[in-house]
Amino acid sequence: MSERLIVALDVSDKEKAMDIVEELKDVVSFFKVGMELFYREGPKLIDDLKNLGLKVFLDLKLHDIPNTVARALKNLIDLEVDMVNIHALGGKEMLRAAYLVKDEALKRKGKAPIILGVTVLTSMNQESLEQVGFKIKLSQLVAILAKETKEAGLDGVVASAQEVALIKSICGTEFITVTPGIRRFEDANFDQKRVLTPKKALELGADYLVVGRPIIAASNRRLAAQKYLEEMEGVLHGSL
């Protein structure tokens, strides 16, 4: 169960990140490294996390022309990360280029990370989409992007848990959904707009839950993580 909870290391430097990891590594085995931390600390941080036997989701949301994304992704795969993402809005050619890089890595190394397409950020809502010119419903856009990601051969998507059931109905239950914007009832939403509880997210079929500030900003991070894990365990064992 601990592998289905991904704790986001949304901090500015390695010292802060490793403090969090040291406190949580006995209860959580999967950590997300985003732009802020990776751009400061670089690949050495990934090595340090992997040397502790931990899983790493490298959340850089690549978005560029297909050739550039393919070359960048090859370098990220060589870091031995377990999960990486690219923006699905980059289009079919970019998504397919990413798939081909993964396929080459599988042939060359016998393994490759989970590669995800990012649909619509959980900090956005319908109004946010309309402000940048989208005239369709948010859920329709998510469905289109998820379908294109699957057709390109990638493993799954990053999306709000609110869209998980829709995504699974279109792409199948084996298509992976990684869901940020997860909050227990007593937690603040911060800048997230499309949020759900761990219980509801799992009931809808989410495969991985990403949680940042409610855990890493808690006075007792280990206890906060355990509360999330207990709620998740309760759903899977029918006690909630």
UniProtKB/Swiss-Prot annotation:
Domain of life of the native organism = Bacteria
Q: What class of enzyme is it?
A: lyase
Q: Which SUPFAM superfamilies match?
A: Ribulose-phoshate binding barrel
Q: Which GO terms describe its molecular function?
A: orotidine-5'-phosphate decarboxylase activity
Keyword Magnesium carried by entry: no
UniProt keywords, alphabetically: Decarboxylase, Lyase, Pyrimidine biosynthesis
SMART domains listed in its UniProt record: OMPdecase
**Entry keyword Lyase:** yes
A biological-process GO annotation? 'de novo' pyrimidine nucleobase biosynthetic process
In Pfam terms, one family for this protein is OMPdecase
Q: Which residues bind substrate?
A: 10, 32, 59-68, 122, 183, 192, 212-213
The record places the active site at K61 (proton donor)
Pathway of action: Pyrimidine metabolism; UMP biosynthesis via de novo pathway; UMP from orotate: step 2/2
Annotated EC: 4.1.1.23
Q: Give a Gene Ontology cellular component term annotated to this protein.
A: cytosol
Catalytically driven reaction(s): orotidine 5'-phosphate + H(+) = UMP + CO2
InterPro entries linked: Aldolase_TIM, OMPdecase, OMPdecase_AS, OMPdecase_bac, OMPdeCOase_dom, RibuloseP-bd_barrel
- Function recorded in the entry: Catalyzes the decarboxylation of orotidine 5'-monophosphate (OMP) to uridine 5'-monophosphate (UMP).
Q: How does it assemble?
A: Homodimer.
Question: What protein family is recorded?
Answer: Belongs to the OMP decarboxylase family. Type 1 subfamily.
Recorded protein name is: Orotidine 5'-phosphate decarboxylase
| Encoding gene per record | pyrF
